[in-house]
């Protein structure tokens, strides 16, 4: 968050006006083709090559179209700087298409650690370039060229690590059906993305770049738990659920145990952020960002529900029903957009509250609709999560009462006061929260399961198995493979490595790629 001290809210706002649109096109190959690579039991070299050229061709057209749309965006936002920023950001679309298929092949080969290293290096380069250019006085251009650097580093790293070379396009079995599957997934992502970015569009259009900059930073912190918790877990969960989708009892058991862990973490983090949100902003972003802190406290209560709600996408994808996912996203779009329009009169704070309300309204209907084909009802989900919700509300209430008894504590000024309030309130809250969880569950079982899952999600562990053994998924784990090796999702037998021969196969897994702007990837499996 050093950038928040070097750039102004208006700088972030101008770039967000553009990335609201550009990240939708930037994610074309990431959302759809990687899921296809995961879903197929075997993918020939010819099919993988066809996917690469389709991705590159469509990506090139999107790059040119977006670069030419700059004047229209500038007219919409009444900000001439938007046109030039759009031209620069268009480069990220075409560059990204060079590496998405390679990322998918690495994920299929269970090489999550390699993908994590690529993403970490790309993010580090993004930060270095952005800070360097910001210190040199480049203002919002620092963010633009940092994004281009990130796209180039991700694509280059993927191609270097996964040394797969596509052949020229040719007729290959499954190209048409595979493309249709990918378009269903991407169509869902597009509706979901439009839904989750309508807030940016409305705030930028109605209130301008500066309020949008405040809102954007608050939103980034809001979805941080999702990108740090849900995205790594999705890489394991979707693959595992796909393999046990034929056994309803195992599917139900694994899914409920995973959302139990997410409920423990999400409800606690969400309630704590609602308590200390303003001080987090003071510490992380520095002076001048107080409005972002007020907005963030309205996001906080929705964090836990957001994490849980977004897991219903795992069900749609793992049972091979992306068309149901797409239909749900249409309903979701109507609901959330209506709430945004109703709340817009109250400014960015009203829109933030609309987000929180929308997750509470949609969570249980979303689980009901996703689980209907396999008999997963709302009752089991509610039975798993209500105790965590009750514990978080009770702990937050007690924390507020205790801290109000120390008025001098609340009035301490400056960063030191913010750090003291944040650390003390968080320690007190989590102490009370964990006590409440243990009492309601009559033991520490949820805490033990969470500890086991977090250990299993460490890179060295996820590179060895596809699912946490502690969640009862014996028989579906898979050994690691090199990029391009074949491994059937139903067993762990390995086949020859991929080459440029016509009938060679490549393997399946799933994951996510990191992005400086959280909007493109944080909801990869969300609705």
Features from the language model and the residues they span:
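Alpha-helical transmembrane segments of polytopic membrane transporters and translocases
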Residues: 1, 9-29, 92, 199-201, ...
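Membrane-interface helix-loop junctions in multi-pass transport and translocation proteins
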Residues: 2-19, 70, 75, 83, ...
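Hydrophobic transmembrane helix module of multi-pass membrane transport proteins
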Residues: 22-26, 55-198
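Helix-loop junctions and terminal segments of transmembrane helices
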Residues: 27-45, 107-108, 218, 222-266, ...
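Membrane-interface junctions at transmembrane-helix termini in multi-pass inner-membrane proteins
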Residues: 36-45, 95-119, 136, 141, ...
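Alpha-helical transmembrane segments of multi-pass membrane transport and lipid-handling proteins
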Residues: 53-78, 84-88, 128, 132, ...
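Interhelical loop/hinge segments that connect adjacent transmembrane helices in multipass membrane
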Residues: 113, 156-197, 201, 211, ...
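Membrane-proximal transmembrane or re-entrant/amphipathic helices at the cytosolic face
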Residues: 368-371, 376-378, 400-501, 505-508, ...
């Amino acid at each position: 968050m050093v950038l928040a001290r070097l750039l102004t809210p208006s700088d972030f706002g101008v770039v967000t006006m553009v990335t609201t649109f550009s990240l939708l096109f930037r994610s074309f190959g990431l959302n759809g083709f990687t899921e296809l690579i995961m879903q197929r039991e075997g993918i020939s070299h010819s099919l993988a090559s066809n996917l690469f050229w389709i991705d590159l061709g469509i990506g090139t057209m999107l790059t040119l179209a977006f670069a030419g749309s700059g004047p229209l965006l500038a007219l919409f936002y009444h900000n001439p700087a938007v046109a030039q920023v759009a031209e620069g950001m268009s480069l990220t679309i075409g560059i990204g298409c060079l590496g998405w298929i390679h990322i998918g092949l690495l994920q299929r080969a269970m090489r999550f650690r390699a993908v994590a290293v690529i993403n970490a290096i790309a993010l580090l380069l993004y930060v270095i370039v952005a800070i360097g250019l910001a210190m040199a006085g480049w203002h919002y251009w620092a963010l633009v060229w940092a994004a281009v650097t990130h796209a180039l580093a991700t694509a280059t790293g993927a191609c270097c690590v996964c040394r797969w070379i596509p052949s020229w396009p040719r007729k290959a079995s499954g190209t048409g059906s595979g493309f249709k599957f990918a378009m269903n997934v991407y169509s869902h992502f597009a509706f979901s993305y439009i839904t989750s970015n309508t807030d940016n569009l409305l705030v930028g259009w109605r209130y301008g770049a500066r309020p949008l900059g405040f809102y954007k930073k608050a939103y980034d912190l809001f979805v941080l738990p999702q990108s740090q918790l849900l995205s790594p877990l999705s890489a394991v969960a979707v693959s595992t659920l796909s393999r046990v989708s034929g056994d309803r009892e195992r599917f139900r058991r694994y899914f409920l145990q995973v959302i139990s862990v997410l409920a423990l973490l999400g409800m606690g983090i969400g309630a704590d952020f609602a308590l200390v949100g303003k001080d987090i902003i003071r510490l992380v972003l520095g002076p001048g960002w107080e409005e972002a802190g007020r907005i963030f406290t309205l996001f906080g209560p929705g964090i836990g529900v957001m994490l849980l709600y977004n897991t219903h996408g795992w069900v749609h994808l793992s049972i091979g029903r992306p068309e149901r996912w797409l239909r749900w996203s249409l309903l979701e779009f109507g609901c959330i957009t209506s709430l945004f329009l109703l709340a817009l009169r109250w400014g960015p704070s009203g829109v933030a509250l609309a987000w929180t309300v929308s997750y509470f309204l949609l969570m249980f209907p979303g689980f009901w609709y996703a689980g209907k084909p396999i008999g997963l009802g709302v009752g089991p989900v509610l039975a798993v999560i209500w105790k965590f919700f009750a514990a978080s509300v009770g702990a937050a209430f007690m924390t507020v009462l205790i801290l109000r008894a120390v008025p001098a504590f609340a009035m301490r000024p400056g960063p030191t006061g913010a750090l003291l309030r944040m650390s003390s309130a968080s320690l007190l809250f989590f102490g009370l929260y964990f006590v409440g969880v243990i009492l309601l569950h009559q033991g520490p079982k949820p805490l033990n399961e969470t500890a086991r899952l977090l250990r299993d999600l460490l890179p060295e562990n996820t590179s060895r198995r596809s699912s946490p053994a502690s969640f009862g998924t014996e028989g579906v784990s898979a050994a690691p493979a090199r990029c391009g090796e074949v491994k059937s999702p139903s067993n762990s037998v390995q086949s020859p490595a991929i080459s440029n021969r016509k009938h060679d196969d490549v393997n399946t897994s799933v994951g996510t790629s990191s992005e400086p702007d959280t909007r493109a990837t944080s909801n990869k499996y969300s609705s």
